[in-house]
């Protein structure tokens, strides 16, 4: 058993070499993530050190954090002017499926990932009203929904995951889930989804520099490293 379940430190695993970070809150001063430019630059430097190649900055947009597109673009410009490293930086957003999102979607006021892929999230504990209809509306507008960290949604089960994949919804893995950062249940869900090949991309969902430091010190199963998209 030990042979097939051995773990290693994330820092020694090499999983970030050449990787694209698809989900983080490193853009400073716009949500519950990084607040100071200095800390954001330190996080980008750490990404470089561990081998990350591209970073998508995905600040929250929700009713409680109603970021405006123009303001986010301005802050992104300020960060790119201050940053002197080799990472390729992109701006997108993580969109809560709520009333504000419905308004922004109707207006076409969105910040998608590459290829019109739109990072979306829900409450961890209950689904939004008429979720499937909202996802279908996103697709009807020419976007492709990417569900952030599905392993963290306690209201979802295997059947629901399969339904969403049947709707061509992409899944984004939070890599810290595989180390137990969000508790044992999210870890088990993440491992099952990974083994089932349901994830399309991954990220750290980084909100604090200390979280990346803790992630690098954490243990991860060797047997799942090659499955991380």
Where are the regions a protein language model picked out?
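Hydrophobic faces of well-ordered beta-strands that scaffold small-molecule active sites
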Residues: 20-26, 55-57, 89-93, 118-122, ...
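Mid-to-C-terminal alpha-helical segments outside catalytic/metal-binding sites
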Residues: 5, 216-229
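Extended substrate/RNA-proximal surfaces in nucleic-acid metabolism proteins
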Residues: 2, 68-168
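A general structural detector for well-ordered alpha-helical segments in enzyme core domains, enriched
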Residues: 39-43, 75-79, 134, 160, ...
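An N-terminally biased module of ancient metal coordination in phosphate/nucleic-acid-related enzymes
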Residues: 1-86
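Active-site environment of divalent metal-dependent phosphoester hydrolases
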Residues: 62-65, 96-98, 151-156, 178-181, ...
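Non-catalytic positions within long, well-ordered alpha-helices that form the structural scaffold/packing
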Residues: 48, 139, 194-195
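Short acidic/histidine-rich active-site segments
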Residues: 198-214
């Amino acid at each position: 058993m030990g042979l097939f379940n051995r773990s290693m430190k994330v820092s020694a695993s090499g999983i970030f070499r050449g990787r694209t970070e698809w989900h983080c809150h490193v853009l400073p001063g716009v949500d519950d993530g990084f607040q100071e430019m200095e800390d954001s630059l330190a996080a980008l430097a750490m990404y470089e050190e561990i081998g990350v190649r591209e970073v998508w900055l995905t600040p929250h947009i929700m009713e409680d954090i109603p970021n405006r597109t123009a303001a986010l673009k301005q802050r992104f410009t300020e960060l790119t002017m201050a940053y002197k490293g080799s990472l390729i930086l992109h701006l997108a957003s993580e969109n809560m499926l709520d009333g504000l999102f419905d308004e922004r979607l109707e207006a076409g006021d969105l910040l998608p990932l590459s290829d019109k892929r739109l990072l979306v999230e829900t409450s961890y504990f209950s689904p939004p009203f008429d979720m499937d209809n909202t996802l279908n509306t996103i697709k009807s507008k020419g976007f492709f929904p990417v569900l952030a960290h599905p392993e963290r949604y306690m209201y979802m089960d295997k059947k629901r995951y399969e339904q969403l994949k049947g709707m061509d919804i992409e899944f984004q893995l939070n890599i810290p889930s595989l180390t137990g950062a969000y508790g044992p249940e999210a870890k088990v869900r993440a491992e099952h989804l990974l083994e089932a090949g349901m994830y399309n991309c991954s990220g750290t969902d980084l909100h604090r520099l200390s979280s990346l430091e803790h992630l690098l010190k954490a243990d991860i199963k060797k047997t799942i490293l090659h499955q991380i998209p």
